[in-house]
Amino acid sequence: MSINNATIKRIAKDVKYIMANGSSLSSENIYYKHDEENIMKGYALIIGQRDTPYGYGYYFFEFNFPYNYPFAPPEVRYLTNDGAMRFNPNLYINGKVCLSVLNTWAGESWTACQTIYSILFTLSTVLCANPLLNEPGIREDHNDVHKYNYLVTYKNVEFAICKVLRLVCFDEDKSFNKGDVMIMKLFKAILSETFTNNKEKIVEFINANRVKYHDLINVSYNVNSVSTSVSTSVSEANSRRHTRRTNLHISVYNLKYDLDYDILKKLVYELNIA
């Protein structure tokens, strides 16, 4: 199918606007690069805000534009994805991004007035302080809201920061999707600069969240009843670092993880990005 000239002109207009207003995006830790060979593709990086569970994390998206753009929305694929962890109700482990503006979620649907620029800001709002509240029917008093924030905070450092940097800067995991890694590498300079500038802040972020979620550290969860019990005494926890572990279960998505907060700072400190 040939590409409509109106579609080409509109995509070019959207990209030109982003280039002219890049500072307003970067000030919100949003970055966009359009494919230099295929006008129907674009790529985005959103760095999580510090006051959310996504703090300093690198979240990548691929845009695939339809031949009738802007009368239909682009298909947006989520790339910061290990295939197991559900980082957000709107971000599926198969890469699907569910947003009303993309016609993939209930609510106000896509119109031709929307642009790449507006989509980027909408995506950034998904990475919010209490992401589980994006799930229909979940209220602030739900048992999983606090636990899910804790899990996302942990996996954000482990995967969206440390693993992503190892993939991009050190080619660590050859089994990871090569195409996705190539997209991530388009932003390598930004990753290197921001991590170098924020390394100590990331450690502070880890420490702050360790205090914030102190009630969940050293707590094990019965995955059937989702009840809690303290696994070790405070004195034992202070004397035995390996006991600072949480067996966490998020019933909404049936996520089960063994978390050890002590390893996160080590993962960060081991990263030396030139």
For every predicted segment, state its role.
Residues M1-G57, N68-A274:
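UBC/E2-like fold recognition across ubiquitin and ubiquitin-like conjugation systems
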